[in-house]
């Protein structure tokens, strides 16, 4: 379970969800435990004690002295930035001493490897990206389930991977397929993780305070791929396509792309438009035998030039999730499921079935022919750009909060194209206002979200959408993004009551 180590002594840094899962897993396998947190009494300490886990707890600043006493593995929680000086010093000391530094994902990878010696060989699918991870992960899980597979969905989406694995072992119900949502934080400490197929949905500015630079952030995303992992890449995103193998590279892993245009390479996915209808399509070689339309395509002669046709899969409007960005998410999920040779028919039925996730471009009400859309999970600029372009209608946008040092410049073009007005809230409202001034779109600041919603309702015209997609974190005004969504919904409910409508 721990490489070549038998019941090692483990130092767990940070007692969040992943840290607690690491502690549980290590205790389950007889490891000696030391747990450290910068907080003297982190919330999960009570859970640790209630479960009877025998561990030494140390609260306070991290120091290299935490490694003393025979520590063999450091288990690092994903919320801890490696750039924080005290943590960086501790990790450097661990490296000098030859102490392994793993995150939960590496513990999980090592556990699957150990279980493999007993014959357990599941398929593993993984998803990362700045935006769309949860939707695509949930959808991929549903697709695999509707194909008759026993599926476990875990990771950044919750539950923690190790907790889900432990429960599957206890219930003697190990899944056929693991579908993992993985953040850049979780991937940062990946060492031997090698899923069967993995997707990078997009890479835009986010978490730069944690990674230090955009390049470091993108590099962490790329750690989702093992040497033989099928790569599912968004061809519309230049940062993502940097992970495509060089043309003609020897022993290059299989690569499948998806995008919002017509695919031109055999086996890729995209959108094709005909008579005003957008279709989800797969590019297929007309000259290929039928069996070559599966993901295990036979190698072609180098001189063969494919005659590409667009094989229609389903109309994009048949998806219950709205927006072009969700069509892209659906294509990514379909590509992942096909990468492990699941049959297409049940996958297409499942695509029509999926209703989406809360707070992700979720239409919560239509009042006087105006849609009210909750995208409170849109905590970065890329998410808001995707929501604006995806809805593709006139919009009164509500944005603002803690911008986390982002560049708001990418909002200019979609705001100019789609927005009737922008209502601004939160700490970085002035920064967003300055950035959007060149659009010529009316901009108004509001002290509360409730005030912004009511003002947006007054400006919206029939056929418009009032969209909460803040492009910012929520903690300057709310407990979290879900609380922000609750306030938005309550304000919309109040508008419905005022207008005598049913939200």
Curated annotation (Swiss-Prot):
Keywords (alphabetical) are: ATP-binding, Cell cycle, Cell division, Cell shape, Cell wall biogenesis/degradation, Cytoplasm, Ligase, Nucleotide-binding, Peptidoglycan synthesis
Annotated metabolic or biological route of this protein: Cell wall biogenesis; peptidoglycan biosynthesis
Q: What class of enzyme is it?
A: ligase
SUPFAM superfamilies reported for this sequence: MurCD N-terminal domain (SSF51984), MurD-like peptide ligases, catalytic domain (SSF53623), MurD-like peptide ligases, peptide-binding domain (SSF53244)
Report which reactions are catalysed by this protein: UDP-N-acetyl-alpha-D-muramoyl-L-alanine + D-glutamate + ATP = UDP-N-acetyl-alpha-D-muramoyl-L-alanyl-D-glutamate + ADP + phosphate + H(+)
Q: Where does this one sit in the cell?
A: Cytoplasm
Name the EC number(s). Answer: 6.3.2.9
Gene Ontology cellular-component annotations: cytoplasm
Residues that, per the record, bind ATP: 129-135
What is the protein's known function?
A: Cell wall formation. Catalyzes the addition of glutamate to the nucleotide precursor UDP-N-acetylmuramoyl-L-alanine (UMA).
The family assignment reads: Belongs to the MurCDEF family.
Q: What is this protein called?
A: UDP-N-acetylmuramoylalanine--D-glutamate ligase
Lineage, opening ranks = Bacteria, Pseudomonadati, Pseudomonadota, Betaproteobacteria, Burkholderiales
């Amino acid at each position: 379970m721990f490489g070549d180590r038998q019941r090692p002594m483990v130092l767990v840094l940070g007692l969040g969800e992943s840290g607690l899962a690491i502690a549980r897993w290590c205790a389950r396998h007889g490891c000696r435990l030391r747990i450290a947190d910068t907080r003297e009494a982190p919330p999960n300490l009570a859970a640790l004690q209630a479960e009877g886990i025998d561990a030494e707890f140390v609260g306070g600043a991290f120091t290299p002295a935490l490694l003393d006493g025979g520590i063999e593995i450091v288990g690092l929680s994903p919320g801890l930035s490696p750039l924080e000086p005290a943590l960086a010093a501790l990790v450097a000391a661990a490296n000098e001493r030859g102490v392994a530094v793993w995150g939960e994902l590496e513990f999980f990878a090592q556990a699957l490897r150990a279980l493999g010696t007993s014959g357990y060989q599941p398929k593993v699918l993984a998803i990362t990206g700045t935006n769309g991870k949860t939707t695509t992960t949930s959808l991929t899980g549903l697709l695999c389930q509707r194909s008759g597979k026993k599926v476990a969905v875990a990771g950044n989406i919750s539950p923690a991977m190790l907790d889900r694995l432990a429960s599957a072992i206890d219930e003697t119900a190990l899944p056929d397929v693991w579908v993992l949502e993985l953040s850049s934080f979780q991937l940062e400490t990946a060492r031997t993780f090698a899923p069967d197929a993995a997707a990078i949905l997009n890479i835009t500015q986010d978490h730069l305070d944690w990674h230090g630079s955009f390049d470091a952030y993108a590099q962490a995303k790329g750690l989702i791929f093992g040497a033989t992992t099928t790569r599912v890449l968004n061809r519309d995103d230049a940062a993502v396509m940097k992970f495509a193998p060089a043309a003609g590279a020897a022993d290059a892993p299989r690569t499948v792309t998806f995008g919002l245009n017509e695919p031109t390479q055999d086996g890729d996915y995209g959108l094709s438009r005909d008579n005003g209808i957008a279709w989800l399509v797969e590019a297929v070689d007309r000259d290929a035998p039928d069996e070559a339309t599966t993901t295990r395509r036979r190698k072609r002669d180098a001189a063969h030039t494919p005659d590409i046709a667009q094989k229609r899969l389903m109309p994009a409007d048949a998806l219950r999730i709205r927006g072009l960005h969700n069509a892209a998410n659906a294509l990514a999920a379909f590509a992942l499921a096909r990468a492990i040779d699941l049959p297409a028919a049940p996958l297409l039925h499942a695509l029509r079935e999926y209703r989406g996730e809360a707070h992700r471009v979720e239409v919560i009400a239509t009042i006087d022919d105006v849609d009210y859309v909750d995208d409170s999970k849109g905590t970065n600029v890329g998410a808001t750009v995707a929501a604006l372009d995806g809805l593709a209608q006139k919009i009164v946008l509500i944005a603002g909060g803690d911008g986390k040092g982002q560049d708001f410049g990418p909002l200019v073009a979609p705001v100019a194209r789609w927005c009737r007005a922008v209502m601004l809230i939160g700490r970085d409202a002035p920064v967003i206002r300055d950035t959007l001034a060149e659009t010529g779109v009316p901009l108004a600041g509001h002290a509360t979200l409730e005030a912004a919603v009511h003002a947006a309702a007054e400006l919206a015209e029939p056929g418009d959408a009032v969209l909460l997609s803040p492009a910012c974190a929520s903690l300057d005004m709310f407990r979290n993004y879900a609380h922000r969504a609750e306030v938005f919904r309550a304000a919309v409910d109040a508008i419905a009551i005022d207008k005598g409508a049913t939200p």
